[in-house]
């Protein structure tokens, strides 16, 4: 730091050891946990953000630069959901319907990537546009896989909720019915 400290540390560190200090998390607290990054959802979000960034760079370098907004927005949204899932914000902010927001993000991204990739490959002839289209098709597949998995999870959750409601309804009907009315 400037200005330099006029009084240096009076007791230097021992030659072979290191001074134990408090664990300062710093910026490491913002990094996702390794367990989350190794999970299927973490890998999908990493692939989505990586492919979106590569597609964005390809569109910036191509003559199809009119399409660069969609990959940029999808990159930022994928980073946001990666951060939100890694920091477990969905548990902290339960007022938001996280699975539905993630599902809609993936569906719209898959459709938009598919449309602009077809247009970039068919209409433009430079190599960067073709590369952006190919990476866009890969991103379409990754986003479609993600929304398929989210849809299956939501469908399982809703089936469990329906079966619990049905058993509760049957129990209340049995309790309210008069068995002596034969």
From Swiss-Prot:
One of its GO terms (biological process) is positive regulation of B cell receptor signaling pathway. It is found in: Membrane. Coiled coil: none annotated. The chain crosses the membrane at residues 64-84, 101-121, 131-151. Signal peptide: none annotated. The keyword Zinc does not apply. Pfam families: MARVEL. Residues 1-21 are annotated as: Disordered. It is a multi-pass membrane protein. Expressed in the leukocytes, placenta and testis. It comes from the Eukaryota. GO terms for molecular function: cytokine activity. Belongs to the chemokine-like factor family. PANTHER family: CKLF-LIKE MARVEL TRANSMEMBRANE DOMAIN-CONTAINING PROTEIN 3 (PTHR22776:SF3), MARVEL-CONTAINING POTENTIAL LIPID RAFT-ASSOCIATED PROTEIN (PTHR22776). This is CKLF-like MARVEL transmembrane domain-containing protein 3. The lineage of its organism: Eukaryota, Metazoa, Chordata, Craniata, Vertebrata.
């Amino acid at each position: 730091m400037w200005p330099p400290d006029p009084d240096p540390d009076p007791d230097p560190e021992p030659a072979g050891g290191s001074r134990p200090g408090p664990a300062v998390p710093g910026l490491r607290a913002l990094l996702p946990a390794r367990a989350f990054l190794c999970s299927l959802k973490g890998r999908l979000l990493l692939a989505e953000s990586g492919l979106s960034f590569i597609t964005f760079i390809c569109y910036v370098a191509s003559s199809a630069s009119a399409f660069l907004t969609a990959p940029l927005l999808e990159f930022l949204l994928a980073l946001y959901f990666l951060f939100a899932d890694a920091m477990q914000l969905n548990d902290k902010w339960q007022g938001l319907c996280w699975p539905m927001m993630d599902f809609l993000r993936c569906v719209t991204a898959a459709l938009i990537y598919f449309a602009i990739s077809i247009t970039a490959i068919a209409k433009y002839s430079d190599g960067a546009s073709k590369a952006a289209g190919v990476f866009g098709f890969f991103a379409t597949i990754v986003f479609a896989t993600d929304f398929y998995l989210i849809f299956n999870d939501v469908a399982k959750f809703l089936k469990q909720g329906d079966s619990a409601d049905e058993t509760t309804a049957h129990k209340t009907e049995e309790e309210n019915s008069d068995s002596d009315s034969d």
